[in-house]
Amino acid sequence: MLHENKTPLTIVTGFLGSGKTTLLSNVLKDKSFAGTSVIINEYGQAGLDHRLIRRIEERTTLLSGGCVCCNRREDLVAELQDMLNAHQKGELPLDRVILETTGLADPAPILFSILTHPLLVHHFYIDMVIACLDAANGELHLQNNPESVKQIVAADRVIITKTDISSPEVVETLRQKIQLINPAAQISTAAHGQVGIDIFAAPIAPDIDRLQNLSATAGEHATNIHSMAIQFEKPLDWLAFGIWLSMLLQKHGESMFRVKGIVDVGELGPIVLNGVQHIIHPPQHLPDWRDYEERNSQIVFIMRDIQPQQILASLNAFQHLIGAEPEIKEICLDPFA
């Protein structure tokens, strides 16, 4: 298996006041998290959140005085190395690591630091990014704070928090906006910071049926973000597709916010594809298709300053160049135009 003998690392992000610490504090009380270590990054020098997670104080580390997405990444790497060393010496159980970012963090540089480090990549894998979005203030955060949008774009799962102080109509409107920003994300809700521990069951692939039913009506956002989901009816040549994707990210990596999907390469099971900006997670090979009703490739792209038609034209041109032209069923979601 791809992740055998590796420790999952979950990134929990979300804008300031979105309820990250409250949610973690409640979840970590479950006995199934007894072997979980937590790293909490706070922007200021005097940290507080780590003191709120008292249940696992001996396994909670504070990284303060800066954000791990920029000037504190070396501290994050050093802390993960220390955890690994302690675990190998038998001093620390390490079933999972959870990193809670600051409210101003962009998850992409954090992913880059972990996925490109020669030691960490052999001992840790990022199983998912969870983003919290405050139901009471989430719409304003998305409108006024680019960091909030980046957190949603990078997320595999988005949790709408504080639904206990928001109306169902507000929550539903926010859900629709999240779907339009990141069609690949799975969305949950939390009242009083309470969620099931199943939120840590990593999502694998986007729900194409849901994507097909989305209406692109949201969006009073004056932004240049576009999203698209495409479906291939025939197996893809994995080597050729990988070359095309690498070329695309090399040229447009900073503008390609998210690539996520499940790819049929003609084998017994699919390949799970997951990338943020120019960083692609190591592809995960699944043993079979038992969790999917249909056997086909489904891929979501979220990008800035790039029209969906440009991506499709580029892929079609490359497929034509190598003499492989699988049937493509495109779904263009362009809520921000």
Please describe what each predicted stretch is.
Residues 2-18, 22-141:
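Nucleotide-state-sensitive switch-loop elements of NTP-binding domains
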Residues 29, 36-37, 51, 89, ...:
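A generic "cationic amphipathic patch" detector
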Residues 40, 72, 99, 162, ...:
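Small/polar loops that bind or transfer phosphate-bearing groups
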Residues 129, 148-151:
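Small-molecule kinase domains that catalyze NTP-dependent phosphoryl transfer to phosphate-bearing small molecules
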